[in-house]
């Protein structure tokens, strides 16, 4: 019999799918793993293994804690990198730009304060504490506590607060706007006593208060008789007084905040696995001048401890400079002269490389603790002032201090530019002012200064109602206006040779220059002449050489 007839409108019975070879999976798409995917998985596993192995070796950190600029460098498996740009924290090759961080700390207004005599029992998020009070009140309280070594608190005690801060380029940018809240050149004071002649001389140049510590135990770690930095804090809530308050901190606290800033950005610059596994630097090699005393070295170690380093090693700056140039790897005994002209100090050292141990022995040193790039900047500001006044401009009498700060920054940039170009311009603009003493010729108050290169539109029209002029600074102008400073800068060279045992200039095998101010062409020329035309080592960025040597000196 045939199949039953299909009724109209009734559903047709489904047909069985055709199966090839009788396999029920023949028509289903097969799950395939491509070779590219396999290779990607293998590569990822290999990268993970390499990253895990990368955690087994030590990455060293070296920091040049300078008077005006500081630099950090890391050494990973023999490869040294400088931490570049204190804003992004990115890494750069040795000699890269943007590595220097201004040794400047801008203190912020406290978020809270204690009443007099009140204790803060909650745990601190950081251990950055300070003492606050008016200048007069602090001096009275410190005098009172001088005879009370137990440091007991009283109802009239100053307030203890936690104060935030900004470090580096951001702080330097605020130096002109709020100089009373900005601290710099703290390295000149660290580890010294208040009665030290250098401290007393610095009192005339610093915009913040410096008072003697006679009040233990706060600020912590500050020895009795040590200088304390007082930063004006216009924050009336701190005290029941309408007078300006003063934040008091030891100099090593400034160093600690700079070191902490560099530590944080150095950790951000680490490779992916170390950065994301929460790696932190527990040890540090920090450079110090050869002439640092025991107290100054101890204060530097305290600053490193307050910055979060469990251990810190001190390395003398000229030794770090020689290591940066790889002179310690030479198989011969060598006599090296290191010339370090920084922003605030000049240090000259004669070293001898011991062939057997490949270590450097310091034979003699000399220097000038009050000669550096800042002195050249001030001399150039004087040169600029003379040129502007001869052109009919005068300085604003009501805000001369702020104008001086701006001029210093501008002339510093102009000075640095002369290391690469033959001349640089400074554009000054001012508004017309009434003539003084009945002089019918108008004068102009300078309100804008900025460095200017030749291709920077120097011939543009003046703004309406203002007069502008461009003053050109050449290398010869710099040499003539700073001739006395250049002579001072050469004097420690002969003194260091004498202190090293009357070493003859011809006995020097290598002359190494470091420090940002050693870029000055007149300095390099005079050094070469002092050693009978010998070439001066300057292939390593002088700004970063000491930090590179510090990072390379230990387990690298």
Range-by-range predicted roles:
Residues 1-30:
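Short, low-complexity, Lys/Arg-enriched N-terminal segments of secretory-pathway carbohydrate enzymes
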Residues 24-201, 212-220, 241-248, 268-556:
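Oxyanion-binding/catalytic loops of NTP- or PPi-dependent enzymes
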Residues 206-240:
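Short acidic, low-complexity segments enriched in Ser/Thr/Gly/Pro
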Residues 263:
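Cofactor-binding beta-sheet edge motifs in enzyme active sites
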């Amino acid at each position: 019999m045939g199949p039953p007839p299909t009724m109209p409108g009734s559903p047709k019975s489904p047909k069985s799918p055709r199966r090839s070879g009788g396999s029920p999976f023949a028509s289903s798409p097969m799950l395939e793993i491509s070779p590219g995917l396999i290779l990607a998985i293998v590569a990822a596993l290999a990268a993970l293994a390499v990253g895990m192995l990368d955690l087994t070796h030590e990455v060293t950190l070296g920091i040049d804690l300078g008077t005006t600029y500081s630099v950090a460098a890391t050494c990973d498996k023999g490869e040294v990198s400088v931490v570049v740009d204190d804003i992004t924290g990115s890494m750069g090759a040795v000699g890269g730009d943007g590595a220097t961080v201004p040794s400047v700390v801008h203190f912020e207004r406290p978020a809270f304060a204690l009443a007099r005599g009140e204790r803060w029992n909650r745990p601190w998020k950081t251990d950055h504490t300070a003492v606050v009070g008016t200048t007069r009140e602090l001096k009275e309280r410190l005098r009172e506590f001088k005879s009370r070594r137990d440091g007991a608190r009283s109802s009239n005690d100053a307030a203890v607060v936690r104060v935030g801060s900004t470090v580096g380029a951001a702080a330097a940018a605020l130096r002109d706007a709020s100089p009373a809240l900005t601290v710099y050149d703290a390295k000149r004071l660290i580890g010294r006593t208040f009665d030290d002649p250098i401290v007393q001389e610095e009192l005339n140049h610093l915009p913040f208060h410096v008072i003697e510590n006679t009040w233990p135990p706060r600020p912590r770690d500050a020895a009795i008789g040590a200088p304390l930095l007082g930063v004006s804090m216009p924050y009336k809530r701190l005290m029941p007084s309408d007078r300006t308050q003063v934040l008091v901190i030891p100099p090593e606290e400034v160093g600690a905040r700079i070191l902490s800033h560099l530590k944080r950005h150095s950790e951000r610059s680490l490779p992916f696995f170390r950065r994301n596994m929460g790696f932190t630097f527990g040890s540090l090699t920090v450079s110090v001048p050869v002439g640092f005393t025991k107290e100054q070295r101890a204060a530097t170690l305290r600053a490193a401890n307050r910055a979060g380093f469990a251990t810190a090693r001190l390395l003398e700056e000229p030794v770090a400079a020689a290591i940066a140039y790889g002179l310690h790897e030479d198989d011969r005994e060598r006599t090296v002269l290191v010339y370090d002209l920084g922003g605030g100090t000049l240090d000259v050292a004669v070293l001898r490389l011991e062939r057997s141990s490949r270590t450097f022995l310091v034979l003699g040193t000399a220097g000038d603790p009050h000669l550096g790039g800042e002195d050249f900047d001030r001399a150039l500001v004087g040169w600029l002032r003379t040129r502007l006044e001869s052109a009919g401009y005068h300085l604003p009498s009501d805000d001369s201090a702020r104008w001086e700060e701006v001029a210093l920054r501008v002339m510093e940039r102009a000075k640095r530019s002369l290391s690469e170009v033959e001349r640089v311009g400074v554009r000054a603009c001012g508004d017309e002012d009434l003539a003084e003493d009945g002089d019918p010729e108008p004068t102009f108050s300078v309100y804008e200064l900025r460095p200017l290169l030749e291709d920077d539109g120097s011939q543009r029209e003046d703004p309406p109602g203002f007069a502008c002029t461009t003053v050109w600074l050449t290398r010869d102008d710099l040499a003539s206006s700073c001739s006395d400073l250049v002579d001072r800068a050469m004097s420690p060279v002969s003194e260091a040779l004498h202190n090293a045992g009357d070493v003859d200039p011809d006995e020097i095998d290598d002359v190494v220059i470091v420090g940002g101010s050693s870029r000055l062409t007149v300095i390099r020329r005079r050094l070469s002449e002092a050693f009978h035309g010998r070439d001066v080592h300057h292939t390593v960025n002088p700004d970063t050489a000491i930090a590179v040597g510090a990072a390379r000196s230990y387990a690298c």
